[in-house]
Every structure is written in C-alpha cells, then in structure tokens.
Amino acid sequence: MVASVFSDKKFVAYFSMEIALESDMPTYSGGLGVLAGDTLRAAADLGLPMCAVSLLYRKGYFRQSIDENGKQHEGTVTWKPETWLKPVSEKASIEIEGQKVAVKAWRYDIKGETGHILPVFFLDTDVAENSPEMKALTENLYGGDEHYRLGQETLLGIGGIQMLNALGYSPEFSKTNDQSKHIGCYHMNEGHAALLTVGLLREKTGRKSGYTAANIEDVRQLCVFTTHTPVPAGHDTFPITLTEKVLGKETADELVRMEVCPDQRLNMSEVAIKCSRFVNGVAKRHAEVSRKMFPHCTVESITNGVHATTWTADAMRALFDKHLNGWRADSNYLRYAVEIPIGEIQSAHKEAKKALFKVIEARNGVAMDADTFTIGFARRAAEYKRADLLFQNPARLQAIAGKFPLQIVFAGKAHPKDMGGKKLIENVIKGAKALGANIKVVYLENYDMELGRLITTGVDVWLNNPVKPLEASGTSGMKSAINGVPSLSTLDGWWVEGCVHNIVGWEIEDPAYAFASDKDDGRHRDVASESIYRQLEQTILPMYYKEPVRYGEIMRNSIFLNGPFFNTHRMVTQYLQLAYSMSAK
C-alpha cells in the first residue's frame, strides 16, 4: 500500500507544535500532541518514509496540583531530555528579531511493528551563543504572550525547514544531487507550523520577498494543512506590527501582499491555506464547520483516529493477541472481535478497572469498588467541554445513585491563563462535595498519557458532553471504544460518525447552540443533563446491573464496530491516498 502510493520514496515531513511520544516526556499538553504521536506511530507501522519536527520544551507544560477548594496550581516540570532523546551533531540557524539564533536538535526514533524507523526531531535553542530571550523559546509549551508564541512558531516553521536541510532532508525542488531524502510533502498539523511555507519560499527563491504566483504554486504543491479548530477565535493571529518585529519588515510586507493578514493581523491558518494543495478538517462535521469559516477554500474531511496498540489496556492487549492475529500492525483486524466471547471481554475489562483503581487509591487515598458502575470524564478542562454538567441537578444524580450505585472519575488540566477552565475544575470539586458520601468522586491530578490510558480503559462508560459544534473531533472516546468502553456523548465531533444509539453507546440529546444569541441561559444545560440522567436511570444502569450480558454486547460492539475505523492506521492510509500522494494534488 505505502509502496504503491510513495513508490518514488519521497519523504513526508510532519510539523507539529506538540507531539506525545512518552507519558513522562513533556513535549505535549493534550489532544493535538496525542494525535500527532499516534499519527507517527501508525506511519511507522505502515513503513511510511516520514520524519517529524517539533520543539523541545525544557520546562514542559506544567505540573498540576488541585487544592481542597478545587483551585488549580501550576508547578514547573523538570526532566532530562537525554533520558529519551539523542542529540544530533547537525546545527542550523535562523533570524528572529534581527538576531541570529543557533538551533540544535534532539532525535527520537519511533519503531513500527515491522521494524521501520521514523525519526522525530525536537528543536532546541538552549545554545551558549544565543541571548537569554532566544534560549527561552524552547522552555515552555503554550507559555508566554503573543510575542513569545510568534517566536516559537517562527522557530518551528522556518527553523524546522533549516534543520531538516542540515540533516539532509531537502524539498523536492532542491537542486541537491542526493535524492535519498527528498521531501515530497510537508504536513502542517494545525496553523502553528504555517511559517514553514515562508521557509520553503525562501528556499525556493533565495530571497525574503518578491514571490511570484509561480513561486507560491511550487510551494503549494508540496504542502498539506490539517485544521483542528472549529471557531474563528481559535486560530492563531498576530498583529502585523509584531510580525514586522519578529520576522522583519520585508517578510511582513510580503505576507500582507499575499493577503493572509486580514484586519492587520497575520492569520496562521490563512497562511497555511494559501500555500497548501490539500486542506482537511478532522471529522465530517468539523469539515462542514470549517468550510463556513473558510468559504474560499475546499476543506476535505479525514476523521481522526487513535493508535490502538498504544491505548489498549494490558489485559485487553493480551486478549486481542489471543484472538486477533495481526491486529497490532493493522487495526482493521479489530473487526474480528465480534467472535471474542463476551465473558472474556468483561474479564479483561475488570482487570483494567482494577489497575485504574489501584492508581486512584495510591494517588488520592480513595478505595473504589470494582463492582460499581464507574463514569469516566478526562480531557482538557475547557469551558465548552462542560465537565461540570453532570452536577447540574445534584438531587437527581443522588436519586439515581440510590437505585443504582455509581462512582465517577475526573481528570484534566486547564491552561494556566484559562480562568474559565480553572473555574470548571472548581465547579467539579464543589459538585462532588455536594453529593456527599453516597457517590464517590475523584479528580486525578496531572492528566498525562499513562493516566489517560488507565481512565479510558478502566471505566464503564465514557462521558462526553461538549457544546455543539465546538468539538472538532475528540479522540478519548475512540480509545475507550477500542477497550470495550461505550460512550454516552453529545452528537458532535467523531461521535456523529461513530454513534449507533443503543448498539455501541448512547447519544446525549443536546441542541446545538454555540453561536445562538441565548448561548448559555441554562435551558440547554438542563436539556443535556436531563438526557444524561434519564439514560443512566432508565437504560444504562439497569442494563449494567440487571442484564450484564446485554451490556457486554454493547462493549463488544464498540470494539468491532468503532475500532476498525477510528484508528490511525486507517487515518494515515487516508492521508496517503488523499493528501500525501502527488497524484492527489
């Protein structure tokens, strides 16, 4: 498959602001980085000639602690890059704010199921000759102000092109005689990487301005852009005055001439769209929303996925190894899970549940009951995700728990500057206290890859209730599905495609209202929360306790119906066919 699409062996260069490769390696903050890591792992499994570029964050994102009142506090992360990464000898340099900035890199090798190696390069400006300001560019992920962010995005895009050149990876139009590492496609994972197109224009022309339509078209034929943001305010923009300061007036004027600076602000998504031959959203619904935001652009759809082997619980992996020969290299084999006995799936799930509860007791000192129905909610603490919706009517929830025992597991970080997200965590802690001792509720600190795997695999239902249509895709429910954990979710993001009501999970009845004038008057929350309560009380909990075989069927359905499609083996194959192949342009 890969050979037929990439028979000329040209490389794909994948650029992402964050990439999650190891749980304890703080080069990611959330879903974007996790998707990037899963994409690269799948590409390695498929033997795709690919390399990747990101930034090294010496202070990571942040270490989270939550006090008894639910207030989030941020601490500094400390880690040693050499624990996971190997320094490369090659160096590069770029100009930022008129300063020459030296750039070094660290390498991480992903080994696919067939032994194929995919290198990931992390850029680092902690170099002796750099100024303190430039050294700090690779300290914090999503830290600082607009000035800091534009510096980082310049480093990722333009610096990434320079580093790849130093490492021997050159764009297809390069005149180098070495054909072994020619790049046939540059993939921008979100707009943070958009300035790589400026780096390519400079590489193509040898100058910082005066680009012709033909120059832009040459770069456009090499570039692919994936947008993950469903609202205009979520796309990175920077004042043109700041752009002049960081990139230089000549480059800033050229970007204005390219019509990617509406309202005197450099729009990174517009840069990426202008210079890409293929643009996609990350789910069918998200592509529809994106087409309205960018009516001048054709936005295709490639729905996200997860790397099945990475996110499957140990006991479930062993079960799949027993019954599904070849599933690790090709997630499509998960369709044969239809033949796995329900009792074996439930036994493997019980082991995953015990593994989660062991960690909960060690961290929070709370002993959870493995025989009690457990709701899971773990993701970035952002207002639109509504982590506190379950507590909309505490008396109603308590009444349900009086009939059917239940317990709840939460986790998730709020961005340090997101006051609304922080308030959400406070609301969850406050809501948990209001329930009293009848319902055990835990909030686990420092949500990371390993904790994510434990929670998505160890609960009995995965709750997801974002405001529609603000969830571009979401992938945590995909992880739970592969582990036989059904979702109770708003019909948004991937669940629009994945939900077969009462077969693989359940739909929360929730009107779309994100752009309505009565955005948050309480009625919408009441409708959505009542749908959650009603389905828990009338369908889900009675089935779990009184019809365990029927619940087991739902679990198995989620594996063999959702698993074969919502994975990165399928997703990367679609990128190969629709985006990376030069025949797709």
Residue ranges with predicted function:
Residues M1-K585:
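Catalytic cores of carbohydrate-active enzymes across secretory and cytosolic contexts
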